[in-house]
C-alpha cells in the first residue's frame, strides 16, 4: 500500500486514477440535509474536477442551492485505494455538449453518451477542492 495523503491538491497517483475511465460517486446535499448520491463520469482540469450533467436533474438543483459536494473515485479492480475530493462547485452551461462528448470517448469510446441528444440542456459542474484525501 502506497500510503495516505490529505491536502487541497491532487497528488500525481490520485490524478492517474481520476484520468482513468473509473466511475465516480458524486455526493450533494438534499434540501432536508440528507446526502444524495449519483454515479458520474468526470475529468480533471488541474486540481478541479469537471462533471457533465443536465439542468433540472436533482444533483444540479442541489448544487445550485448548496454548492458543497464530494466526489469519491476508486478503481473497480482495487476498491481499497481511493481519492475523495471535497469542495465547492460552480455550474456553467455547456450548450454544445463538449464535455459530455469528451467523457463519452473516455468511458465508452463512443462520440456521445447513450441517452445524450443535441437538445439536452447540458451543464458543466466544476468542483474546486478544499480537501483531497488519497489512499493508495
Listing of model-derived features with the role each one plays in the protein:
Residues 57-59, 78:
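Short, surface-exposed beta-strand-loop junctions and turns on beta-sheet-rich folds
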Residues 2-24:
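Short, basic/aromatic recognition patches
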Residues 14, 22, 47, 81, ...:
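A generic secondary-structure signal marking the coil-to-beta-strand transition
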Residues 54-55, 95:
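Short beta->alpha linker loops
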Residues 1-9, 79-136:
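Charged, gly/pro-rich active-site loop segments
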Residues 54, 75-76, 129-130:
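Short secondary-structure boundary segments
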Residues 21-54, 69-73, 83-84:
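Short beta-strand segments
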Amino acid at each position: 500500500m502506497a500510503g495516505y495523503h490529505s491536502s487541497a491538491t491532487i497528488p500525481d497517483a490520485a490524478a492517474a486514477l481520476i484520468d482513468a475511465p473509473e466511475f465516480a460517486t458524486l455526493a450533494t446535499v438534499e434540501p432536508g440535509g440528507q446526502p444524495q448520491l449519483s454515479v458520474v463520469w468526470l475529468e480533471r482540469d488541474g486540481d478541479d474536477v469537471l462533471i457533465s450533467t443536465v439542468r433540472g436533474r436533482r444533483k444540479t438543483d442541489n448544487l445550485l442551492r448548496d454548492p458543497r459536494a464530494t466526489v469519491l473515485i476508486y478503481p473497480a479492480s482495487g476498491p481499497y485505494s481511493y481519492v475523495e475530493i471535497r469542495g465547492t462547485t460552480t455550474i456553467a452551461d455547456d450548450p454544445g455538449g463538449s464535455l459530455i462528448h469528451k467523457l463519452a470517448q473516455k468511458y465508452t469510446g463512443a462520440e456521445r453518451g447513450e441517452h445524450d441528444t443535441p437538445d439536452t440542456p447540458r451543464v458543466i459542474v466544476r468542483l474546486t477542492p478544499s480537501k483531497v484525501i488519497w489512499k493508495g
